[in-house]
């Protein structure tokens, strides 16, 4: 069980992801870089008790950032977009 919580790190909440939730019932999560689609699907079904129809993954590359004289990179991560069965939903925020 703890393995599943190590794979799924956090939900990604933006205006675009909220539109995906409303229109297509797709949820976006930040996941471990070593996770594959099958592991992500099993983890989400176990944690949230929903039927996941599909999982799309994408590696987000680090971006160069500069603040005054300081330069650096943001950290890269892997993101998963998961489609949930119709009629089911994942309660990400308590206010929804």
From Swiss-Prot:
Transmembrane segments: none
A single Gene Ontology CC term: ribosome
SUPFAM superfamilies for this protein: Ribosomal proteins S24e, L23 and L15e (SSF54189)
Family statement drawn from the similarity comment of this UniProt entry: Belongs to the universal ribosomal protein uL23 family.
Name listed for the protein in its UniProt record: Large ribosomal subunit protein uL23
A single MF term (Gene Ontology): structural constituent of ribosome
Assembly and interaction partners: Part of the 50S ribosomal subunit. Contacts protein L29, and trigger factor when it is bound to the ribosome.
Swiss-Prot/TrEMBL GO biological process terms: translation
UniProt keywords, alphabetically: Ribonucleoprotein, Ribosomal protein, RNA-binding, rRNA-binding
Role of this protein: One of the early assembly proteins it binds 23S rRNA. One of the proteins that surrounds the polypeptide exit tunnel on the outside of the ribosome. Forms the main docking site for trigger factor binding to the ribosome.
InterPro entries: Nucleotide-bd_a/b_plait_sf, Ribosomal_uL23-like, Ribosomal_uL23/eL15/eS24_sf
Entry superkingdom: Bacteria
């Amino acid at each position: 069980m703890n393995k599943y919580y190590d794979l799924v790190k956090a939900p990604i909440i933006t205006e675009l992801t909220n539109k995906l939730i409303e229109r297509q019932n797709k949820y976006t999560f930040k996941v471990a870089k070593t996770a594959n689609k099958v592991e992500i699907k099993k983890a989400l079904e176990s944690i949230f008790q929903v039927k996941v129809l599909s999982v799309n993954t994408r590696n987000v590359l680090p971006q160069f950032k500069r603040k005054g004289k300081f330069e650096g990179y943001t950290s890269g991560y892997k993101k998963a977009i998961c489609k949930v069965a119709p009629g089911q939903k994942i309660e990400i925020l308590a206010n929804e």
